[in-house]
A protein has these predicted regions:
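Hydrophobic alpha-helical signal peptides and transmembrane signal-/tail-anchor segments
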Residues: 13-16, 52-61
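N-terminal start and proteolytic maturation junction detector
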Residues: 6, 45, 54-58
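Cationic, amphipathic, low-complexity segments that mediate targeting or membrane/lipid association
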Residues: 37-41, 45-49, 63-66
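Residue-level detector of structural "landmarks"
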Residues: 17-24, 63
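Short alpha-helix boundary/capping segments
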Residues: 4, 26-39
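N-terminal helix-forming leader/targeting segments
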Residues: 1-8
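Acidic, metal/ion-coordinating pockets
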Residues: 69-338
Length: 338
């Protein structure tokens, strides 16, 4: 017990109950070092027997590591927000998630936020008021006509960068933060995607170089809205070391291939969606199943019920722009009906 108290001065306590393993998305309350010192000092020695084991590690839990390193910037990115359930869940939880996860900068993909197709100015404003610094999109960006005029005057509402020159709106933005400049690029893939756009590989590389050279942005985040895993992985490999993160969207299914490439670029094929869980990609599953069984066109309403919030947390060294950590984010909740 004395050894535990001694080592605790240079680390934190990790409590491991061998009787059960917490699920990956379970919230873990992190206690600061001083609080743990007090806890252990008054903890009976006999309580350290049996299935209850104590391990000592240097530093805080991963979720709090960034607090002790002033050069680290933590980005939270949330995948495609689907319909009213998805946006209500995100708006209701975003500020709390920011605090719980020690987030510095928030990006959300809002491309399905309006009844599952596109986004409206009101929804975009609501998401920004909730804490989103930038909203990205994809192939459904034009589904709500009123968003066109809004994009002309709101550079934080992005459409894919690789639309032809002269297209209304912005495909990228650089924002100043308390930890330096952060660049965000939104691009759309070409494989199995409509409409066919300009080459995203060339467009993203050119824009990332411009951001670094002309605007001094070291931290650059790319939302690559694409269908195939091969195109997404190729994009990440193509610009490894040039940007801080390449995170895929569009498929609505969170993948488990998070990694940091050799050049320092964090990567995940798809962040997943923020939308109804009892569904097919956020839509009521029965009409989708019937469409597959009969080939008869049907409407696919946004589903209801439990909602999942899916995304990713990326830690970046603000001085070098290199990613130092990446972790999937996953949270389920019940929405109260009005």
């Amino acid at each position: 017990m004395q050894d535990a108290q001694q080592h605790l001065k240079t680390g934190v306590v990790f409590l491991n109950f061998s009787a059960a393993v917490a699920p990956a998305n379970q919230k873990v309350k992190v206690i600061e070092t001083k609080a743990i010192e007090s806890l252990v000092a008054n903890f009976p020695a006999q309580n350290f027997t049996g299935s209850f084991q104590v391990f000592l590690f240097f530093g805080f839990f991963w979720a709090k590591t960034r607090r002790s390193n002033k050069s680290m910037l933590r980005i939270l990115f949330l995948g495609d927000i689907v319909g009213e359930p998805g946006r209500k869940a995100v708006i209701s939880r975003l500020k709390a998630i920011k605090e719980e996860q020690s987030v510095d900068f928030i990006i959300v993909n809002g491309e399905n936020a309006a009844a599952g197709r596109g986004i409206t100015p009101k929804i975009a404003i609501d998401l920004m008021r909730a804490g989103a610094a930038v909203i990205t999109s994809g192939d459904h960006i034009w589904d709500q006509q009123e968003i066109v005029e809004f994009m002309e005057m709101e550079p934080r509402m992005l459409r894919p960068l690789n639309y032809p020159e002269g297209t209304v709106g912005f495909g990228s933005i650089v924002l100043k933060t308390g930890k330096g400049k952060v660049g965000v690029i939104n691009a759309q893939g070409r494989t199995f995607m409509q409409p066919p756009l300009e080459n995203p590989f060339l467009a993203v590389e050119a824009e990332a170089l411009r951001m670094r050279e002309e605007e001094g942005a070291e931290v650059i985040f790319v939302d690559f809205h694409a269908e195939t895993t091969s195109e997404k992985i190729a994009m990440g490999r193509s610009i490894d070391g040039l940007v801080s993160a390449v995170i895929g969207t569009h498929t609505h299914v969170q993948t488990a291939d998070e990694q940091i490439f050799p050049g320092g670029t964090a990567f995940l094929c798809d962040a997943g969606m923020c939308g109804p869980l009892e569904s097919v990609l956020g839509r009521e599953f029965k009409p989708v199943v019937e469409r597959f069984r009969t080939a008869i066109p049907r409407r696919f309403p946004v589903a209801k019920g439990r909602v999942g919030i899916r995304g990713v947390l990326v830690d970046v060294d603000e001085k070098t722009g290199k990613a130092t950590g990446i972790r999937r984010f996953s949270e389920d909740l019940e929405l109260r009906e009005p």
